[in-house]
Every structure is written in C-alpha cells, then in structure tokens.
C-alpha cells in the first residue's frame, strides 16, 4: 500500500526541521511526501548534521555538514512541494538525497533567508562618499569601522555566520543593468570611514570614491571557504527533478556526485526579489557521475560561478581490497 505523507502532520511550518525528519522516517517504497503549500522554515541549530565529503568544497576544514532536508537510502518515492517554499536559516545545505534510487522531486522553491553573498546597491555617490543600500534580508552592523554581515539564531541568540566585509570578502562582481562583470574594486577595503545611516543603508567615505555608478549592485563572496553546498545528491540513481525554483544556494550550488541517471526539467535559478545573485558558486555541478544527465527547459540566472559544470574527480586512495577493488 502506498501513502501520501503530509509534512504538516509532523511539523509546524514555522519551525519544520525536526518534524520533517520524522515524516521522512515514515516513507516507504511508493510513498509521496507532501508539503501542503506554505513557507516551511528550517533553522540550522534544529537540523540534522553529518560528517561527509562534498567534492570541490573544503571538507577538511568543514567536515560536519548541516542539512535542512536529508533523505537517505530510500527507493521509489516522490517529494511534492505543491508550490511550497523551503526557507533556509543558516549557512547549510537545503536539500540532500544520499544513497537513494528512483526519486521524484517536484514543485517547490528553495530560498535562503539571508544569502551568504553580500550585496550593496549604490544609491548616492559623490567625489569621496557613497551610500549603499543592503537588502532587507541581510543583517549587518558597523563596529570599529568594519562592516560585518551575520545571521542570528532565534533560539540560541548566537550567529550562524559572521563575516567582515572589509577583510574577508574577496570576490566582487558588479551588476550594472544587463551587464555583469568582475572587479578588483571593493566598497569597503579602501573606505576611510564606514557608518550605518539607516536600517538598510551604510555610508562609506573615501579619499576618492570607487568608480561605481548609482544603481550598481556590488556582490561580494563572503570568503574563499566553500563549507557546504546548496543541494546535494550522493550515490543516487534515477533521480528526476521538475518545476523546482532556486532563489539562492549557499556554498557550492546544486552538487551531484557519484550518481547515475539524473534528470533536471523546468528548473528556474533566479534570485529572490531585491537580490541579484542566485548561488555562492555554481548552479548545477556534476562530478563523477555515469549514465545520463539531462537538463531541459530550464532557466539559469546570475550564479557567482558556472551555470553548469560537469567533470570527473581526483579521489584519495585508501587501500587495495583485492586485485580489482580499491577503497577510496
């Protein structure tokens, strides 16, 4: 007998992580996990975490990965979002399949409450002063002449992440109308004085203002650390994804590694309103997979790296099990 298992039978949409884990544990072959249309909020300090390796990330520096939704070792299941949005709070992976076979993921949106690319829009400019507007979802403070971005847990009061724009943000991209280009210029590193002038504005004073224009949006990577990815498939086969919208992904985009037969149809990678960047790095990233990878009828917009990246991988050789088998 197959069942439709509703996430709302196990969780409150305002704090979904622990209840969704219980719902996933109930899934059997042929079942569908349904998210009745709503916004489902996932907070990092309420989510599951495991040590695992993700290619192209700093897994040695950050081996412990946090997951908003983690489905492991399930076969012949469907996850139907019914148009829902998964809202991610914290620098973690939004959705992961590990060791799964014949899974359909359909009709949901992934949105990060506070993206980890930091954006500053030029709203006023003079010879030695620029005022920048920061999106409403990005919390920040100015202290000791340093601009710091952060996201705070509502449970512990501790920050999920804290990054200082003056020193840590190293890769700057300017969005100017339909143009997007990389620049070595920084809104903060050469600032003589940084002052918070409103709930969402900062003023930077310079010896000579950078040659930004009013309307430019400067997008900054928080630092070089790729400690996780936005969505993650590992050792899975026959996975079908359809009508999924991604507003942003932390870490390293939508990563599939050591998988077989993947289909991506009608995906939309588009920043949420008020933002310009849809991913900290790549959008779809495929490593060490076999069979087919089909990407059809999809829209890709403004990642901070590649839209699609497919490659093999160097793996660590651990030991020879026999003449034909190695442990990697």
Language-model regions: role of each:
Residues 95, 111-176, 309-328:
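Autoprocessing Asn-cyclization modules and mimics
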Residues 160-235, 240-242, 247:
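Long, low-complexity, polar/charged, intrinsically disordered or flexibly structured peripheral segments
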Residues 5-34:
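Acidic Gly/Asp/Thr-rich repetitive segments characteristic of extracellular carbohydrate-active
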Residues 54, 259-293, 320-325:
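Long amphipathic alpha-helical scaffold regions
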Residues 35, 78-81, 102-107, 214-215, ...:
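All-beta strand scaffolds that present successive hydrophobic residues in beta-strands
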Residues 89-100, 107, 238-243, 256, ...:
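Extracellular beta-rich repeat passengers
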Residues 21-26, 41-78, 87-106, 114-128, ...:
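Extracellular beta-strand-rich solenoid/capping regions of secreted or surface-exposed proteins
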């Amino acid at each position: 007998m197959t069942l439709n298992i509703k996430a709302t039978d196990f969780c409150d949409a305002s704090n979904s992580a622990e209840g969704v884990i219980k719902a996933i544990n109930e899934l059997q072959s042929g079942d569908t996990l349904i998210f009745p249309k709503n916004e489902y909020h996932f907070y990092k300090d309420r989510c599951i975490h495991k040590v695992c390796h993700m290619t192209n990330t700093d897994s040695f520096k950050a081996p412990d990965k946090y997951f908003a939704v983690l489905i492991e070792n399930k076969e012949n299941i469907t996850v139907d979002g019914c148009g829902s949005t998964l809202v991610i709070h914290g620098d973690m992976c939004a959705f992961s399949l590990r060791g799964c076979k014949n899974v359909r993921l359909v009709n949901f949106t992934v949105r990060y409450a506070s993206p980890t690319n930091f954006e500053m829009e030029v709203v006023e400019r003079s010879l030695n002063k620029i005022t920048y507007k920061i999106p409403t979802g990005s919390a920040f403070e100015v202290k000791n002449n340093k601009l710091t971005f952060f996201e705070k847990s509502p449970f512990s009061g501790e920050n999920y992440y804290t990054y200082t724009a003056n020193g840590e943000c190293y890769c700057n991209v300017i969005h100017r109308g339909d143009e997007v280009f990389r620049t070595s210029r920084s809104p903060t590193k050469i600032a003589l004085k940084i002052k918070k002038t409103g709930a969402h504005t900062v003023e930077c004073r310079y010896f000579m203002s950078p040659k930004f224009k009013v309307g430019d949006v400067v997008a900054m990577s928080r630092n070089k650390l790729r400690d996780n990815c936005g969505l993650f498939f590992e050792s899975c086969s026959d996975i079908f994804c359809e009508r999924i919208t991604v507003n942003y992904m932390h870490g390293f985009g939508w990563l599939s590694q050591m998988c077989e037969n993947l289909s991506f149809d009608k995906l939309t990678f588009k920043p949420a309103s008020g933002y310009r960047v849809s991913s900290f790095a790549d959008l779809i990233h495929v490593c060490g997979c076999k069979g087919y990878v089909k990407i059809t009828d999809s829209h890709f917009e403004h990642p901070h790296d590649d839209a699609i990246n497919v490659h093999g991988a160097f793996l660590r050789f651990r030991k020879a099990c026999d003449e034909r088998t190695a442990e990697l």
